[in-house]
């Protein structure tokens, strides 16, 4: 059991028989009434995001998540195939379950698969990934004076805003938490 006062971003908890990851939290102490914790949670089984309020001091179960290092192999229709790096065992995950992560996955990429009581519940990506630009407008001399940005389509289909100096074929470092451009690789 863990107190909601000890919530941290990335913590996994069990509430109402479901496994949730804390995305955001805020301790609120109103002038009148009891303090509470407002949180934004992601269901690790379904990917649904829910805002939930807990009373300060309320206890919830901490979910013990095991991780296994695996390699993303390929997409097989609506299923995505991963291989354990030690045992060479393969597992399939439905696209719906890893919808957010698919924007960053490349073939042969190493990731951690999250397991809860033997059930595969999701993919844990590294903080940043390197992706190649496949389509973007050419930068025009003088564009950078205003410090603007332009859209760029990456090899996984993800579209991010990038500085004007980025060209097709460049490899970029992308933040997997929010899908933003970090730098050139």
UniProtKB/Swiss-Prot annotation:
Keyword Cytoplasm among UniProt keywords: yes
InterPro entries listed in its UniProt record: Elong-fact-P_C, NA-bd_OB-fold, Rib_uL2_dom2, Transl_elong_fac_P/YeiP, Transl_elong_KOW-like, Transl_elong_P/YeiP_cen, Transl_elong_P/YeiP_CS, Transl_elongation_fac_P
SUPFAM superfamilies per UniProt: Nucleic acid-binding proteins (SSF50249), Translation proteins SH3-like domain (SSF50104)
Pfam families linked to this entry: EFP, EFP_N, Elong-fact-P_C
GO-annotated cellular components: cytoplasm
Protein keywords: Cytoplasm, Elongation factor, Protein biosynthesis
Record-given protein name: Elongation factor P
Protein source organism: Geobacillus kaustophilus (strain HTA426)
């Amino acid at each position: 059991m863990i107190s909601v006062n000890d919530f941290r971003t990335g913590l996994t908890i069990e509430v109402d028989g479901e496994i949730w990851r804390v995305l955001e939290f805020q301790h609120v102490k109103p002038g009148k009434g009891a303090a509470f914790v407002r949180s934004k949670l992601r269901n690790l089984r379904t990917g649904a995001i829910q805002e939930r309020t807990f009373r300060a001091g309320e206890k919830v179960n901490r979910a013990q998540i095991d991780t296994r290092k695996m390699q993303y192999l390929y997409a097989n229709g609506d299923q995505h195939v991963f291989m354990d790096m030690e045992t060479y065992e393969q597992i399939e995950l439905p696209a719906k379950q890893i919808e957010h992560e698919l924007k960053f996955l490349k073939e042969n990429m190493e990731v951690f698969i999250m397991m809860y009581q033997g059930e595969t519940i999701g993919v844990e990506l590294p903080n940043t990934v390197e992706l190649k630009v496949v389509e973007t407008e050419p930068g025009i001399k003088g564009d950078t004076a205003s410090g603007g940005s332009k859209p760029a389509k990456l090899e996984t289909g993800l579209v991010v805003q990038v500085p004007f100096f980025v060209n097709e074929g460049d490899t970029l470092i992308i933040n997997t938490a929010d899908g933003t451009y970090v730098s050139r690789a």
